[in-house]
Amino acid sequence: MAKSPETEHPVKALGWAATDNSGTFSPFNFSRRATGERDVQFRVLYCGVCHSDLHMVKNEWGVTHYPIVPGHEIVGIVTEVGSKVEKVKIGDKVGVGVLVGSCRQCDQCSNDLENYCYKQILTYGAPYLDGTIARGGYSDIMVADEHFIIRWPENFPLDAGAPLLCAGITTYSPLKYFGLDKPGLRVGVNGLGGLGHVAVKFAKAFGTKVTVISTSLSKKEEAMQHLGVDEFVVSTDPQQMQAAVGTLDGIIDTVSAPHPIVPLLSLLKPHGKLIVVGLPDKPLQLPVFPLIQGRRTIAGSGIGGLKETQEMIDFAAKNNIVADVEVIPIDYINTAMDRLLKSDVKYRFVIDVEKSLKPQ
């Protein structure tokens, strides 16, 4: 049997991996490549737990290669840089988000939209250039091309800032691209979870009036008092939904469970935009009449390019925007995944990798 290219990698690493679609994690020894001339190696301090990690470890999208080491909200301290690296130096705080590679030549890459490159390489679970499967941040060491490294602002929290590398850019980018960042606009956020609470924070920082749409009345007090939303609509209450018809310029739909979108479209003004950023594991039904009636738009958005991700992190640092997190040791990850499946987290788990990942 041919050897895996990973066996040639000299950097010994320790992580936690799922080895089958039960999604159960256990310690996992593997190797990373040596630091190339344009690579940055860093010691992982924290890694956020994204809902997509749960989908991937259970192979719900049918693309998972086992064993899988998830994690694409990764922050740490640089320990080694290649000879041609100019972006960061040893000792700097850095982050890596959802991408670690792209072709760097296509129109999308040329326009700083590596996230839409057809040859993009995801931070974990995807084949890398050398034929190995990329391993994510549930591990003690990362090596990445400097182009995909995010510089971390001084005094910006590492633990609460880490989820912004996915949840932050996933919501910041569509707010900017679709023009929903103008003061005075009325923006809806469907779902108040890991993505939704960050979307609220960015939308408020842009000066918009924010309406949270949720199935959970229990989240109203938190949304109004802690997050400062302007309106809260319970989507299962027909009277509340009727009162909100035609009031919103746009909606960021963060829900990752299958859900009807006709009620959301009714909340939009004419020419309003429904932007889907959640990842349900089943198709959503697309109604045509509400689109035609008000020239409304349904669109999608996926993370952001590296330039925009750096812009987002800098904006967040300037405006004191962080995720609300529960910091956990890495040996709690199986329990955390069970809780995530039940939406029992407010609002994002973050693994304290440095303090809790130890050789077994």
Swiss-Prot record:
In the record, the note on similarity to other proteins reads:
Belongs to the zinc-containing alcohol dehydrogenase family.
Q: Which reaction does it catalyse?
A: (2E)-geraniol + NADP(+) = (2E)-geranial + NADPH + H(+)
Q: State the needed cofactors, names only.
A: Zn(2+)
SUPFAM superfamilies per UniProt? GroES-like, NAD(P)-binding Rossmann-fold domains
Explain the purpose of this protein.
Involved in the production of citral, a mixture of geranial and neral with a strong lemony scent. Reversibly oxidizes geraniol and nerol in equal efficiency. Also active, although at a lower efficiency, with cinnamyl alcohol.
Q: Which organism is it from?
A: Ocimum basilicum
Activity control, per UniProt: 66% inhibition by 5 mM Zn(2+).
Q: What's the name of the protein? A: Geraniol dehydrogenase 1
Q: Which gene encodes it?
A: GEDH1
Q: Where does Zn(2+) 2 bind?
A: C103, C106, C109, C117
**Gene3D superfamilies in the cross-refs:** Medium-chain alcohol dehydrogenases, catalytic domain, NAD(P)-binding Rossmann-like Domain
**Per UniProt, what is one Pfam family of this protein?**
ADH_N
Tell me the PROSITE patterns matching this sequence: ADH_ZINC
- The UniProt record gives the binding positions of Zn(2+) 1 as C50, H72, C166
EC number from the UniProt entry: 1.1.1.183
Q: Which GO biological-process labels does this protein carry?
A: alkaloid metabolic process
> What SMART domains does this protein map onto?
PKS_ER (SM00829)
